Amino acid sequence: MRTLCSLLLICCLLFSYTTPAANSIIGVSEMERCHKKGGYCYFYCFSSHKKIGSCFPEWPRCCKNIK
């Protein structure tokens, strides 16, 4: 019984450890999507740029030049 509990605890710790890695993969895909649209990721968009999306979780905005 002790071995089973230990094994279950190890499995839970492994799965909880891999969760942040999935979030960083999502962030990379958001950044790639922004760059493919010709934008850039930044905290604020400049006055001559508009927000076209998000680069979550690293940056809150994907900005693009209006020109």
From Swiss-Prot:
Gene: Defb9
Protein name, per record: Beta-defensin 9
Domain of life per record: Eukaryota
SUPFAM superfamilies the record matches: Defensin-like (SSF57392)
One matching Pfam family: Defensin_beta
Location in the cell: Secreted
Keyword annotations: Antibiotic, Antimicrobial, Defensin, Disulfide bond, Secreted, Signal
Tissue: Weakly expressed in adult and neonatal brain.
